[in-house]
């Protein structure tokens, strides 16, 4: 591997050539920048590579940044930009201008028109950087999008469609997972993952790599079981019933603990397969009680468990532990136990970022983790030189016997420094430690600002003011990372910013990040750590005797470079353990990643396909083979097909009726028979869908297949997660847990594919039958307009006077005989016949509603009025009705009026058939009218 020195020498020469173009770039007019961008794009289309055009592109971007921001990039910033384009991590000290550095590779790679993602650790930084750098990109003619958690899908799609998109790491990963859950390809928001630049790369790619991104859905809750597991954990004694590994923070039941578990839950064997769920609950309860601390890993607020980012101290809103650990913590803290979630989609940051064609990153400290960057991400860490020499003084640690002694000395030093006016930044490792220090500072009447998981809203504002005279800022870990602490006027003369770290962090780079807040751009400064034997790191990595000797110091301390080196070595050991843990997570996730890629790729194929017959055909073969296996029995050590049983299951249901006889199953290999059955399945399936519109079929097929994929992939994730949580027990049987996991996870994946195929074949069969049935019903109740009736009458030659069952059936019988060989015409005629017969039924129904024993005569009067003719009620005849009706039809062009007349005519014909009754009723009506005029509105008939 090429050394940093040689690379920096090479990149330095390139940077010099970029700077040499400055006079030429100064001649550009503002409108020339867009023309330059178009010219660069054309060069790439003509076959030039990014490296071929890098020097001129960076020179143009440098001039654009100078004009817009008033900042002329230093040589070291150009070197950083070259490192980023090469797909590596640029380690740049605090204050060296990482935001400006990112402009150059972003612009260069945006010219490919494939998209560039600039990733930050929070939305404040994304918004800030997109607003600042967006002005430069606007001059260059490059579009910029800002992604955020509050955006709609349409807004996200718009943001990702831009040349450059600013986004947070979490939102980027969740968008990827959500994109692979959509039911329509057009609903995706991201393009193909091309190139990303990750700000604070160590935080994103290492610190957060241990926590996978998970999208969860609700499932049934088990409140009583969680409470029982919590009560059991409370009944255990730390040394008698448990083995606790402080170094790795793992908790295990020892032999006595296992015995207690069996007694508590009335079990014979905790490790029996049927007790997997109980075992899982117990392990979560043990973690919650003995490995997780309130104020360190989580905090409780408003009856809710909120996760704390271990490396920034920020609350991770919207995040929760999976696999029941969140519920175990809720039981421990006696808050409401939420519904347990099931994982719908998951990915680790490690595997997500490896999906990009090229990744790069910037950070202040990453060299200590270079091995991990190379092994996992295939990226080097190259340290860029500072623009000015670092003159900050890094003092040896002050080591105390107790936390109280350390904090008393801290307060003394803060008081002394504060009296001189120099600003102070106090860094802590947890919210708990932050609150403890705050109490000491308040007791000493020192005014200070605090940033931790419980108070982070004003984070950037507080950090920005931390360099003012007399400022005291208390910050959890690397809160405010990404915001420079600029020294106020006169602070340099006071010795610059003092950084006091309370307790060493798990990783050296986090300590280095804290130190690096002081001494930016050649400013003076000082850093010092106050550590004690009560610190987590010391408890885990020092012997009890050593801790006891330090306790004897009382309030005194040791300031020794040798002991500082010993602490650094302990950190190295812990870094190695954490790397192993992350590598272990990755080893297991790699199996899931391969399976995820297969599922997501197949899902995309299904979303984009216009014809899914090949997919269905393969699934039918799988389903057919499984049916054969299911209906086979073991005879003399061999599985023999139960032919009769198999035939009964498939005949007329999955394959055409009488397609197979029992003899057809003789002397055939199972796979050959499965292919034959699958072909018959497809034959029946195609016959059933032949009359359904093609777009309806493809939509239905796509939905059924995607639903099956999502249903069984979710189940697979759940089972694989539970498998992984207990796989470590295999080591007690002298087995390799990872090898066993690979074997079992692969078997689970194959079973999942079989379940998907079975589900799709069964559901397609059921749904198609329902669609055909619904289609038939739909045709029966088809909505018909007046225009439809006119067209049918015209096409069939029926007269309006022929709207009765006999005439309609006679005419359509003639037409069906005539067109008996035309399948499409016959189908149309059958629909038309049903429409006309349905019309007759409707007319009869309306006639029954109109005609009643009490108002027949008034109905006739109203209907005659409807026909607009004077007819003597007493002598009305069928012939008169037809004659008047036909006369009226010739005069009317309005379909609605024609409809009214058809109904009126039909009603009159029915009434005439009962003429004798009507005449008798007329006499009765006249008698009634003498007594009282009939004014009942219900007797007035409104036709239509």
UniProtKB/Swiss-Prot annotation:
GO terms for cellular component: cell envelope Sec protein transport complex; cytosol; plasma membrane. InterPro entries: Helicase_ATP-bd, Helicase_C-like, P-loop_NTPase, SecA, SecA_DEAD, SecA_motor_DEAD, SecA_preprotein_X-link_dom, SecA_SF2_C. It is a peripheral membrane protein. Its EC number is 7.4.2.8. It is found in: Cell membrane; Cytoplasm. ATP binds at residues 77, 95-99, 484. Residues 920-944 are annotated as: Disordered. It comes from the Bacteria. SUPFAM superfamilies: Helical scaffold and wing domains of SecA, P-loop containing nucleoside triphosphate hydrolases, Pre-protein crosslinking domain of SecA. The keyword Transport applies. Belongs to the SecA family. This is Protein translocase subunit SecA. The gene is secA.
